[in-house]
Every structure is written in structure tokens, then in C-alpha cells.
């Protein structure tokens, strides 16, 4: 069943939240029929919390370390998401696994973005600059970005959307990362727009 528009988004982030900012900018510009309901960070010093404050979105720090266990984090996160009326959970640089209670409550309603063309160069430990180092080490001629549904396994859920990025001669991991990030900032808001308009049916994936 299509998600009602505007999408009621809850963000999960760990650090800078630049993908989240791209989505917030699209909402503010009227290009994405969505509402940001809450930003949850497991890192109290995450810039994503400051981005949330500037955008007028409630921000919340929740971590297993502060709450005492992964189970307590899972419970608290689900309570916060439900309490803010979230219909779609959007991971934006969230460096932890999403807990089983949240996944059970939001079946096919948790999205993540990965800086490669999954299933290549994904899985545990494949994040940040490591992904681009692996792409170059493998001699790939192209890489890209994947938006996918989240399940219990890292970078494993059904693919929602992908965009390709050519690997240039002489690319460094840092140069490739910068170009891929630009594509992330375009693909994530566009994919959410297509979901909001019913062009992508998450339940059909």
C-alpha cells in the first residue's frame, strides 16, 4: 500500500548528516512532499543534531551506552518514532544496526543509502572511505549509489534505486568519495519524492 503523502520521516544519523540536509533542503524547497518529524542520533556530538535544530526538527540522542543495552535502545527508538508519528525511517549515515523491534514495526519502511552499487562493496565494515578504496582496489570502471530497504543484515535489503558514477583515471579514494556524495545528495531526495508520489511501491520490492 502506498505511503500517504506528505511522508512523515524520522531520520537516524551518527555524524554529519549531509544526506539528511539534502532531504531537508528538498522539503523546504517544495520539491519533496514530506515532513521531518524527528532526528535520532546515537552520537551526542553529531552535527546532524545541530542541523535538526536549525531546521526546527526535534532532535534526540539515543545510544546503547547511555541506555544500558541494545535492547533498551531499540525500545526507546521505537517509542520515539511512534511518538512523533513517523511513517518512514530514513537512515542517513547511521552507523549502527537498526534493532529488531524497529524493523518489525516498520516492515519495508526503513531506508538506507550506500555509496556503491550493491551488492558489490557492501556489508559489515564497508562504510565511508573504505568503500571507495575497495572500488579502486578492485579496478572497477564505475561505482555508484544504492538506496535500499533495511533488514537484519548490513546492506542486504531489496534495492529501491541506484545511480551510477564513472571511475575516472587517476581517481583517489577521496576524489571518488566526493563525486559519489554529490550523487547521494541527488538520489536520496529524488527516491523519496518518487515514493511519496506512488511511483515506487516499497511493498512490491
Regions found by a protein language model. Name each.
Residues 1-205:
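One-carbon transfer enzymes
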Amino acid at each position: 500500500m502506498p505511503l500517504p503523502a506528505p511522508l512523515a520521516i524520522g531520520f537516524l544519523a551518527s555524524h554529519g548528516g549531509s544526506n539528511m540536509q539534502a532531504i531537508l533542503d528538498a522539503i523546504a524547497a517544495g520539491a519533496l512532499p514530506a515532513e521531518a518529524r524527528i532526528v535520532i542520533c546515537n552520537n551526542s556530538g553529531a552535527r546532524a543534531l545541530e542541523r535538526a535544530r536549525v531546521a526546527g526538527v526535534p532532535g534526540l540522542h539515543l545510544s546503547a551506552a547511555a541506555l544500558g543495552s541494545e535492547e533498551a535502545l531499540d525500545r526507546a527508538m521505537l517509542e520515539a518514532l511512534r511518538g512523533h508519528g513517523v511513517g518512514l525511517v530514513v537512515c542517513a549515515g547511521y552507523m549502527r544496526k537498526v534493532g529488531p523491534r524497529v524493523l518489525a514495526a516498520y516492515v519495508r519502511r526503513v531506508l538506507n543509502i550506500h555509496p556503491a552499487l550493491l551488492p558489490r562493496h557492501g556489508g559489515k565494515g564497508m562504510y565511508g572511505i573504505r568503500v571507495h578504496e575497495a572500488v579502486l582496489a578492485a579496478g572497477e570502471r564505475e561505482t555508484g549509489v544504492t538506496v535500499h530497504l533495511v533488514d537484519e543484515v548490513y546492506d542486504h535489503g531489496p534495492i529501491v534505486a541506484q545511480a551510477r558514477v564513472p571511475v575516472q583515471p587517476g581517481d583517489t579514494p577521496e576524489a571518488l568519495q566526493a563525486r559519489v556524495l554529490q550523487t547521494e545528495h541527488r538520489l536520496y531526495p529524488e527516491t523519496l519524492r518518487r515514493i511519496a508520489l506512488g511511483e515506487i511501491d516499497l511493498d512490491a520490492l
